Amino acid sequence: MKLLIAGGGTGGHLFPGIAVAEEFLARNHSNEVLFVGTERGIEARLLPRLGYRLECITASGIKGQSPLAKIRSAAQLLYGYAQSRRILKEFRPDLVLGVGGYASAPVVLAARGMQIRRFIHEQNAIPGLTNKLLARFAEKVFISIEESRKFFPEDATILTGNPLRKEILWNVPLGQKTPASDEKLKLLVFGGSAGAHRINTAMIESLPFLAGVKERLIITHQTGEKDQAEVRKTYEQSGFAAEVTPFIDDMAAAYSNADMIVCRAGATTIAEVTACGKACIFIPYPYAADDHQRRNAEALLKKEAGYMILERELSGESLAFQVMELIAHPGKIEQTGRNARSLAQLDAAQVIVDEMTREQACTEK
């Protein structure tokens, strides 16, 4: 059986697709997977390194652009549609899964025209424009968060969770324990592959407020390239035990080692930290489409499965206050992690592959 996975652009779209690909290939050694994305997306750098086949098409967004740019994007969409039809004819997939991102639309639309079974996966609480449009053409819509159900056809929508890569699943800890009162606490701070300048700034501004507990903290801080030197210098001058790195290659190990986490609230990040059962302070990226990161974090706050500081309220003092609150009440670290873990859906990739192959089996009867 052949599966084509369309979309990407960011890790939030791509990583769930990789997780589904891993599960699909594990089912049968004769199964094949082809990814379709764009040359500008993270997929162009990552997928060849992971050994996956990738075809690139021309595609770009329309929302929020000038009238002239919209005309150009519409022309690219038509060209991308033609490219998608060629790829579909050559690869002849049994199933097409759109995971969001610019490349998803022309491929799923082309698959509809060629009567190939097509599905979409939505990672966020507030769906992107692409998936809202494609939902009407999909056999099934897989959602990660219950809050997004209202945007899609009820009879075609299935809550699966956000698929996780095997490297994350294999390192999921058995549980979060309450740290002892004299135990050192490991704080992980990260802001995505390029880092997050605002989080970096707030963290170093928090150090004077955290001075009284610095002997209890061991910090791992992923900054991105730009801020690394300045952040490392500030930790050293302030006397904090900190590992400062531009990138974290092994996120599974980083999650496993952490007691507390400060991070953004992208869908993949939330899926990973809930699977690992970690107490997180979420700082949603305020410019994400439709403010979906805030809504992602709020879904956890409702279940007492995390904490949130909006970026407009973020300061060194506010961040330090939240960290100090967890240090002062270590039982909250365990309970918040347990609540987060209860929301994790570790079998998301399995459920998605099950549903797609079931639809295909119905077609063949």
Curated annotation (Swiss-Prot):
Gene3D superfamilies: Glycogen Phosphorylase B
Membrane topology annotation: Peripheral membrane protein
CDD domains in the cross-refs: GT28_MurG
GO biological process, one term: cell division
Domain of life: Bacteria
Binding of UDP-N-acetyl-alpha-D-glucosamine, residues: T10, G11, G12, N124, R165, S193, I248, Q293
Record's keyword terms, sorted: Cell cycle, Cell division, Cell inner membrane, Cell membrane, Cell shape, Cell wall biogenesis/degradation, Glycosyltransferase, Membrane, Peptidoglycan synthesis, Transferase
This protein's pathway: Cell wall biogenesis; peptidoglycan biosynthesis
EC code: 2.4.1.227
Regions annotated as coiled coil: none
Catalytic activity: di-trans,octa-cis-undecaprenyl diphospho-N-acetyl-alpha-D-muramoyl-L-alanyl-D-glutamyl-meso-2,6-diaminopimeloyl-D-alanyl-D-alanine + UDP-N-acetyl-alpha-D-glucosamine = di-trans,octa-cis-undecaprenyl diphospho-[N-acetyl-alpha-D-glucosaminyl-(1->4)]-N-acetyl-alpha-D-muramoyl-L-alanyl-D-glutamyl-meso-2,6-diaminopimeloyl-D-alanyl-D-alanine + UDP + H(+)
Disulfides per UniProt: none
Pfam families, per database record: Glyco_tran_28_C (PF04101), Glyco_transf_28 (PF03033)
Localisation per UniProt entry: Cell inner membrane
Chief place where the protein resides: membrane
Keyword hit for S-adenosyl-L-methionine: no
Gene Ontology MF, one: UDP-N-acetyl-D-glucosamine:N-acetylmuramoyl-L-alanyl-D-glutamyl-meso-2,6-diaminopimelyl-D-alanyl-D-alanine-diphosphoundecaprenol 4-beta-N-acetylglucosaminlytransferase activity
GO cellular component: plasma membrane
NCBIfam families for the chain: murG (TIGR01133)
Cited HAMAP family: MurG (MF_00033)
Function (record text): Cell wall formation. Catalyzes the transfer of a GlcNAc subunit on undecaprenyl-pyrophosphoryl-MurNAc-pentapeptide (lipid intermediate I) to form undecaprenyl-pyrophosphoryl-MurNAc-(pentapeptide)GlcNAc (lipid intermediate II).
Family, as annotated: Belongs to the glycosyltransferase 28 family. MurG subfamily.
Protein's recorded name: UDP-N-acetylglucosamine--N-acetylmuramyl-(pentapeptide) pyrophosphoryl-undecaprenol N-acetylglucosamine transferase
Organism of origin: Geotalea uraniireducens (strain Rf4) (Geobacter uraniireducens)
